[in-house]
Regions:
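Carbohydrate-active catalytic/glycan-binding domains of CAZyme proteins
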Residues: 24-204
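Bacterial Sec-dependent N-terminal signal peptides
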Residues: 1-26
């Protein structure tokens, strides 16, 4: 093999290494460096907004903005004081107002704002036990919150008050008793987030 071919081969290998390295640095990549679990995202046209668990940090419930679901910028803090570990929030928009439902210190709360960038209200405590609240509007036009263990509770029209007792409406898939699992079956019914599309409700 002559020197010209060797030079071309070396240049080709170097180019391949550069392309591979460039791809590795750009995609896939870490979107948010740090501890930002349990994201809840809504879309408004070309804009996406997100919040996540903030646990024992205050101010908490950081609100993020993105136009591509890759690059996120913090724009607000929805929770100004700490009332317990905050986790598994649900960010929703209903009739022009933004709400974040979240559990903390053995209870459920909601904060709200007319502008996603704030100001956000003080926390409103809801008369509802359970964790991981998920907001949904029923076919009857009424508002509800799902919580863990397949339970649901009705909300007032403004979304700031529970108007009736919660009841179990979904018991999940009963896996075989001979399976070895951690804890009881109902402990896996957590984090209900709901979506209504084309006449169907989806729970994830």
């Amino acid at each position: 093999m002559n020197s010209t071919r060797i030079s071309k081969l070396i240049l080709s290998l170097l180019f391949l290494c550069l392309v591979t390295t460039g791809r590795a640095q750009t995609f896939p990549r870490l979107l948010l460096g740090g501890d930002y679990p349990d994201p809840s995202i809504i879309r408004e046209g070309k804009d996406f907004y997100m919040t996540n668990s903030s646990f024992n940090y205050a101010p908490g419930l950081l609100v993020w903005h993105s136009t591509d679901l890759v690059n996120w910028t913090p724009i607000a803090r929805a929770l100004h004081a700490l009332d317990g570990s905050v986790y598994a929030p649900d960010l929703v928009k209903y009739k022009g107002r933004y709400y974040i439902y979240y559990p903390a210190a053995g209870a459920n709360y909601v904060v709200y704002a007319d502008n996603i960038r704030g100001p956000w209200s003080q926390p409103v405590k809801l008369d509802l036990t359970g964790i991981d609240p998920g907001h949904v509007v029923g076919e009857d036009g009424k508002r509800y919150l799902y919580v863990d263990k397949g339970a649901i509770a009705p909300l007032s029209d403004d979304g700031l008050k529970v108007t009736g007792p919660k009841k179990t409406v979904y018991e999940g898939w009963q896996f075989p008793k001979e399976w070895k699992t951690e804890g009881n079956g109902d402990m896996f019914l957590e984090g209900p987030k709901l979506l209504h599309k084309d006449g169907y409700y989806y729970m994830v």
